[in-house]
């Protein structure tokens, strides 16, 4: 058995996507993101280079393993199978042809699940040293693993109304009734909150933009659900490492970027800008507010780390034209070009005003291990971001190494989670 250690620092990890350096800078300058501004001043911050293909599951599996997709095994948002073939493909080219093949049933897709990851994640390493972990909505965690602590998978909000399968999304299952009582269905999103995004008169008939699907069903309702569920579980278990993820900014970035930055598109009507122009800014402000609440709740010996796995940029004109010609999704924001993400850290031992050196998503796992006080695996690809800690922490906690965490016993997944007929999570656009 591995020795049990006390963590050097307790760590809270908040994951988002679609938040790049430019978005942070403009939001801070406009005064729209006061909590982010405070964290950047009191702590460390900087751009985070990302990976290709720039999709949530491979990028976030890299963030939490410190390994490249070719090593950890998660290479896309889904796996694909051609009709009549037993061969599973991990990557297919994105575009109209593949979309057509899916529509006519010649290609089937299967969501990425926890069985796809071939390398140990942070929670495996921490649990091996006796440190409990709390994991909420991280990509690729369905079915959940039998961790020391708890794990709530990103399928909870999809399966919550199924009395049998809802329980399969949480390990251990003890608090599933309480978690379900905290969930927020799309129809229950507060009207006062909605009015901050879209004017009330515009939410009636005649609005030809499917804003309810993108803003309410795919962004706000799930983010509110996991925020409330995460708060409940964290309070119940109080794990030294807690990780949660908010997907909503990525969703609204894909759908509403054109209205926030009409000058980058040229074909946005003034009426549309009035309707939807503040959705993206308001969503960033909401995330900043939530992160600010978590920062204010930090206790001595705790560090808050906010990570965006990639940014968001306008869909190029040629792709918008192709999309229109082939009946595509009409997205206006994309991260197919691997725009930088962002990292912020604040708390006990973080150096105020620190700026990241050349950093990437590969550096997050080694850095989190270091902050917690565990050795960094030499087979991890990234480096420890030592520039974010103050001199006192650095002197008290030199970086230590271990050859690998891959010799750890595999944490079994829960037996109840059925992988057959698993509904897809809302499709992420590249």
Question: How would you describe each model-predicted region?
Answer:
Residues 45-67, 136-146, 245-249, 310-314, ...:
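Short, solvent-exposed turn/loop segments enriched in Gly/Ser/Thr/Pro and often Arg
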Residues 58-68, 147-156, 319-323, 392-396:
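Charged, often glycine-rich, active-site loop that binds/positions anionic groups
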Residues 67-270:
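His/Asp/Glu-rich, glycine-adjacent segments
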Residues 15-19:
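Acidic/histidine-rich, surface-exposed loop or edge segments in extracytoplasmic proteins
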Residues 4-7, 22-24, 216-242, 258-306:
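A long, amphipathic alpha-helix that forms part
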Residues 22-78, 132-136:
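Short, structured active-site-proximal loop/turn typified by the sulfatase FGly-forming signature C/S-X-P-X-R
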Residues 1-9, 78-114, 119-120, 124-129, ...:
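Membrane-interface soluble catalytic domains
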């Amino acid at each position: 058995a591995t020795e049990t250690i006390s963590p050097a620092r307790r760590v809270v990890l908040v994951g988002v996507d679609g938040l790049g350096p430019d978005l942070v800078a403009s939001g801070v300058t406009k005064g729209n993101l006061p909590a982010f501004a405070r964290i950047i001043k009191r702590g460390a911050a900087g751009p985070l280079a990302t990976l290709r293909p720039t999709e949530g599951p491979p990028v976030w599996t890299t963030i939490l393993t410190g390994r490249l997709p070719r090593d950890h095994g998660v290479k896309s948002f889904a796996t694909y199978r051609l009709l009549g073939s037993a061969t599973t493909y991990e990557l297919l080219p994105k575009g109209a042809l593949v979309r057509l093949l899916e529509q006519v049933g010649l290609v089937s897709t299967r969501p990425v699940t926890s069985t796809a990851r071939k390398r140990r994640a942070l929670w495996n390493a921490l649990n091996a040293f006796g440190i409990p972990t709390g994991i909420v909505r991280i990509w690729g965690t369905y079915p959940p693993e039998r961790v020391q602590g708890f794990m709530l998978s990103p399928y909870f909000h999809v399966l919550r109304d199924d009395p049998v399968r809802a329980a399969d999304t949480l390990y251990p299952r003890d608090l599933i009734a309480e978690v379900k009582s905290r969930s927020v269905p799309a129809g229950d999103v507060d009207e006062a909150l909605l009015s901050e995004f879209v004017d009330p008169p515009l939410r009636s008939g005649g609005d030809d933009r499917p804003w309810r699907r993108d803003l309410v069903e795919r962004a706000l309702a799930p983010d509110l659900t996991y925020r409330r569920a995460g708060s409940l579980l964290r309070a119940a278990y109080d794990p030294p490492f807690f990780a949660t993820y908010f997907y909503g900014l990525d969703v609204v970035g894909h759908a509403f970027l054109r209205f926030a930055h009409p000058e980058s598109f040229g074909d946005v009507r003034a009426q549309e800008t009035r309707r939807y122009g503040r959705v993206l800014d308001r969503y960033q402000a909401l995330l900043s507010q939530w992160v600010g609440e978590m920062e204010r709740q930090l206790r001595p010996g705790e560090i808050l780390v906010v990570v965006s796995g990639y940014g968001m940029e306008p869909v190029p004109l040629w792709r918008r034209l192709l999309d229109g010609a082939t009946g595509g999704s009409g997205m206006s924001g994309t991260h197919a070009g691997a725009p930088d993400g962002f990292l912020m850290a604040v708390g006990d031992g973080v150096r105020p005003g620190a700026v990241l050196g050349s950093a990437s998503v590969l550096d997050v796992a080694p850095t989190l291990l270091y902050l917690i006080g565990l050795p960094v695996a030499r087979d991890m690809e990234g480096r420890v971001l030592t520039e974010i800690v103050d001199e006192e922490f650095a002197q008290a906690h030199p970086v230590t190494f271990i050859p690998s965490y891959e010799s750890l016993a595999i944490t079994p997944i829960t037996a109840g989670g059925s992988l057959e007929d698993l509904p897809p999570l809302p499709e992420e656009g590249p």
